[in-house]
């Protein structure tokens, strides 16, 4: 028999009593015969249990990506499609060992049958106009730091309504920094989804690299910096990595296009006016080095992309955030918060949002959004592991401030620490997109439990492996548990996988 891609499709029998109790589930290798031969084809979904809808509709899936890791495991990402259009459903991932055995299948296995209920009647131009109208703006009145503010405008299927939509991504810096995802019905022009995705808390060979020193918020420390000299000025531009690291001064504006690369007449950036920029520049380099040296990830996107930091955002802004392209730091109001670039955990947290964006792409709502926040917190700890707290360095009141977060004791700082405390909040800005910050305390506590059982070094490796290869964009807490178990098994064996399971079960995730 022939398929479009590969010949010889094998149908696999499964062990009995397989439990498909949740929508997004996974299948372990113990449920697959050891002699299965991987086909690198959606037909692999025929190996699923009869209770999985994806089994009967495997022909509706398309392979989006194929990646081989350093263990030789190949990871395939599949997405549901209909009439040539992809959906916004969760992906399905199939993981194949070097000897062509399927070791793991995960994602939303209860999907497959899809019938589009509308037609395309409005133009792309009309859809973009309606997207801007939905946020009270027009394309002519927003400014983007780089290029067109319309970054994506593809037609996909909204899985909830089964309708074709223009999926439009807007990123701009003026009149305020924003990163919107807006879905416009392709027939009626109705807005089906609207969410601001901000994640809060040219080289010239003649230009030479120079060493420099600077002082950040901690005036007692001198930080070594890499800078670039052009003519008679030294700029906070680090060219010692494959990806350029640049630090800009916004001078209290909110439009990143007004940002200027921080410069000085000497290579001593020690005056107080440079402190926020020095911290941002120094810590961005340290985060780059962490991912490069510990996880072999070249910059945040894995491709040597640039890291741009903007300091002095707005006036007394109590925030720092990744906007989908760069990181922006407020100066704090000085009463409650110091400049946000002065905390290595916060810099690590925000830049990890970029790593998440370029890997699992965890959607910023509900449990997947809480996982997004949690993984950013946990890697913030991995990057600065001297304590279990995130953000205490920017709090004027230090440990007494209730707005910091603790991986060890989330409930001490107004976060849930167990599923019994989980809050199902509205998927709105007022509801914190389903309580992503409050509920992230649950996976944070699970991470703490894992670290105490396996140690930091093993835990950071399995967390990165799960993030890069196993988590899907709509992953729930149970999916994260299983993804981390599989990553632990890959790297350290069954005993480590069991300890990961225990760590999550201790917070009520079974």
Swiss-Prot record:
Belongs to the peptidase M4 family. The active site is at 350, 437 (proton donor). Transmembrane segments: none annotated. Its cofactor is Zn(2+). Residues 25-200 form a propeptide. It comes from the Bacteria. One of its GO terms (biological process) is proteolysis. This is Zinc metalloproteinase. It comes from Listeria monocytogenes. It holds the Pfam family Peptidase_M4_C. Residues 1-24 form the signal peptide. InterPro entries: FTP_domain, PepSY, Peptidase_M4, Peptidase_M4/M1_CTD_sf, Peptidase_M4_C_domain, Peptidase_M4_domain, Zinc_Metalloprotease_M4.
């Amino acid at each position: 028999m022939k398929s479009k891609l590969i010949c010889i499709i094998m149908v696999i029998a499964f062990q009995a009593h397989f439990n498909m109790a949740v929508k997004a589930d996974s299948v372990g290798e113990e449920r697959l015969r050891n002699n299965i031969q991987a086909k690198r084809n959606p037909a692999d979904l025929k190996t699923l249990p009869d209770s999985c809808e994806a089994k009967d509709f495997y022909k509706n899936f398309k392979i989006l990506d194929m990646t081989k890791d350093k263990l030789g495991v190949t990871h395939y990402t599949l997405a549901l499609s209909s009439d040539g259009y992809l959906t916004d459903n969760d992906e399905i991932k199939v993981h194949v060992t070097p000897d062509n055995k399927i070791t793991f299948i995960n994602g939303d296995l209860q999907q497959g049958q899809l019938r589009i209920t509308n037609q395309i009647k409005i133009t792309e131009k009309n859809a973009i106009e309606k997207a801007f109208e939905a946020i009270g703006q027009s394309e002519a009145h927003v400014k983007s730091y780089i290029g067109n503010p319309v970054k994506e405008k593809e037609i996909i299927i909204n899985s909830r309504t089964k309708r074709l939509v223009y999926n439009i991504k807007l990123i701009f810096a003026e009149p305020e920094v924003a990163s919107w995802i807006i879905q416009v019905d392709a027939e009626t022009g109705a807005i089906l989804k609207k969410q601001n995705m901000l994640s809060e808390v040219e080289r010239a060979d003649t230009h030479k690299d120079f060493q420099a020193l600077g002082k950040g918020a901690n005036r007692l420390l001198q930080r070594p910096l890499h800078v670039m000299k052009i003519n008679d000025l030294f700029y906070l531009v680090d060219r010692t990595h494959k990806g350029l690291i640049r630090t800009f001064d916004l001078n209290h504006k909110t439009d990143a296009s007004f940002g200027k690369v921080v410069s000085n007449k000497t290579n001593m950036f020690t005056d107080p006016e440079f402190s926020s920029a020095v911290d941002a520049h120094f810590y961005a380099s340290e985060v780059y080095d962490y991912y490069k040296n510990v996880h072999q990830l070249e910059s945040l996107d894995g491709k040597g992309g640039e890291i741009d930091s903007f300091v002095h955002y707005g006036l007394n802004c109590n925030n720092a955030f990744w906007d989908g392209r760069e990181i922006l730091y407020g100066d704090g109001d000085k009463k409650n918060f110091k400049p946000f670039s002065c905390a290595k955990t916060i810099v690590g947290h925000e830049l990890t949002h970029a790593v998440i964006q370029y890997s699992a792409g965890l959607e910023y709502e509900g449990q997947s959004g809480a996982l997004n926040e949690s993984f950013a917190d946990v890697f913030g700890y991995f990057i600065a592991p001297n304590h279990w707290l995130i953000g205490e360095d920017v709090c004027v009141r230090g440990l007494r401030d209730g707005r910091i977060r603790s991986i060890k004791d989330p409930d001490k700082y107004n976060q849930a620490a167990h599923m019994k405390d989980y809050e199902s909040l509205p998927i709105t800005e007022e509801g914190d997109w389903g309580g992503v910050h409050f509920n992230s305390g649950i996976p944070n506590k699970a991470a703490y439990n894992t670290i105490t059982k396996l140690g930091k070094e093993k835990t950071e490796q399995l967390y990165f492996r799960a993030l890069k290869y196993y988590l899907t964009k709509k992953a729930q807490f149970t999916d994260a548990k299983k993804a981390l178990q599989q990553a632990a098994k890959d790297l350290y064996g069954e005993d480590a996988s069991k300890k990961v399971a225990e760590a999550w079960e201790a917070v009520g995730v079974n």
